[in-house]
Amino acid sequence: MSSEVKINFNWTPQDSHKTKDLLLQLVPWRKGPFSINEVFIDSEWRSHFKWDRFLELDLDLNDKTVLDVGSGNGYYGFRMLGLGAKEVLCLEPNLTHFSQFLAINNFAKSKKIQMLPERLESIQIDTPYFDVIFSMGLLYHQRDPGKHLRLLAAHLKKEGRIVIETIVTPEDYEEVLVPSDRYANMPNVWSVHSEIGLEKLILEQGLELIDSTEAIMTTIEEQRATQWMPFGSFESALEEGNHERTIEGFPTPLRKFVVITIQNNQL
């Protein structure tokens, strides 16, 4: 799973048709793709695009305990195992995504990855446990993004790493853009920070930014409707004929990774 999530084993053509029909009952498949023999789950997001951007950071996951918050169906968790993670715990309260994970791991049969249908705020761990914690596509959905960062840090081992993937806005909006309603047709987007605003937010929580990737514009090649997610997708969130503006008139989302750690003697 270092290059893709692909599972191969012996089965009959009848098994293939039955499996595809059953997996299609779990739409929408947001993250992927997955290959189970010849069954190709062509998800809405080509999530390997994002994972390739993460790989630019060259962050070592070998023999690490990893937490993936808001993990969706576990696609990235399986990719983390492909980089040698010792164990991965995924948190995902959406029961459709949870069911998709159970279906995939029914074939993968990995004991190194588990998923709880819980939010970060619900888990109780007495001591910091994780070497690396991922929060991807969550920060802008938080009413209190600073609290979210502090909760992540509370579960992080000393000298561990937090990986944030989020949307950033151009500096035209100064430190933060606060949509009055939707952003790129997404509800519950409470704040979108500029790169300067994001770094300031991180520092205010007693954390330190130590690495980042370039901010990359989301495209309709990366996120689109498919048989496995047959509803409105990213193209419907953009101005007709202008893929650099959303239907609300905002800049099209720019996504980037940042790696942060706890400052000395903080938290």
Give residue ranges: language-model regions:
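A short SAM/SAH-binding and catalytic strip from SAM-dependent methyltransferases
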Residues: 131-144
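Short alpha-helix
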Residues: 190-206
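Short, glycine-/aromatic-enriched active-site segment of Class I SAM-dependent methyltransferases
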Residues: 167-189
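A short glycine-rich, Lys/Arg-flanked "PGG" loop and its adjoining helix->strand segment in the class I
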Residues: 146-161
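Conserved class I S-adenosyl-L-methionine
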Residues: 64-72
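Conserved SAM-binding loop of SAM-dependent methyltransferases across substrates and taxa
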Residues: 73-84
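N-terminal accessory regions of S-adenosyl-L-methionine
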Residues: 1-51, 106, 178-180, 199, ...
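A short acidic, Gly/Pro-enriched loop at the edge of an enzyme's catalytic core
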Residues: 123-133
